[in-house]
């Protein structure tokens, strides 16, 4: 599994000629890293003198980030698995009309999954950005740069994931499905833009 590789192994595999891991898996990885950074800043605030008033809030942030981290770590492989299913469908036989129809059904199902996985990553990345805004507002200022790093990592993950959603929607014939996911992707992109601006304004010069 990709998530079980060392950092060096993952980077080497990404740099190779293999199609996976690609941008989608890397978006999930960046979102997982953003969750870890966000949780770290919350932990550096919890129980510290002078932050008693926000202790409960920071514990809630830490718990939410801790819950998202393993999900996003699993998405590293889910994204690559979804792409593998697209490739598998492309390789299906198409000599007869029946084979062509079966191949088309398999491709449509694979493309839908390949759009749904990054959409989930984008949702979680935007959620992490909201947590990041909270820690930049209330958290330990000595770790503000770490909090900002988390927000920016989540921002990159959200944008990359949204792009991947849109790319896969271009191959899907179900207009109702594509319209729904496109609206959701647009909403998440706008929300990420807003949260980035709000979060970074909280950084002290």
Each model region followed by its residue ranges:
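Conserved phosphate/anionic-ligand binding catalytic regions in large, soluble enzymes, centered on
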Residues: 16-37, 142-160
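Amphipathic alpha-helix face/heptad-repeat signature
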Residues: 29-33, 61, 68-75, 114-124, ...
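A structural-propensity feature for long, helix-poor, extended segments
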Residues: 49-88, 188, 195
């Amino acid at each position: 599994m990709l998530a079980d590789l060392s950092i060096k192994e993952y980077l080497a595999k990404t740099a190779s000629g293999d199609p996976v891991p690609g941008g989608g898996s890397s978006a999930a990885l960046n979102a997982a890293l953003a969750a870890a950074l966000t949780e770290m800043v919350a932990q550096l605030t919890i129980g510290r003198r002078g932050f008693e008033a926000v202790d409960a809030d920071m514990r809630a942030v830490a718990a939410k980030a801790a819950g998202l981290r393993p999900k996003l770590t699993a998405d590293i492989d889910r994204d690559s698995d979804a792409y593998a299913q697209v490739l598998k469908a492309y390789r299906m036989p198409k000599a007869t009309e029946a084979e062509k129809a079966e191949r088309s059904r398999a491709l449509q199902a694979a493309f839908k999954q390949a759009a749904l996985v990054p959409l989930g990553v984008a949702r979680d990345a935007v959620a992490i950005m909201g947590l990041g805004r909270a820690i930049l507002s209330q958290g330990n200022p000595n770790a503000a740069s770490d909090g900002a790093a988390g927000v920016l990592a989540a921002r990159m993950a959200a944008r990359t994931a949204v792009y991947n959603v849109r790319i896969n929607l271009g191959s899907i014939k179900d207009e109702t499905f594509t319209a729904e996911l496109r609206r959701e992707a647009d909403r998440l992109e706008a929300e990420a833009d807003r949260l980035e601006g709000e979060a970074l304004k909280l950084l002290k010069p």
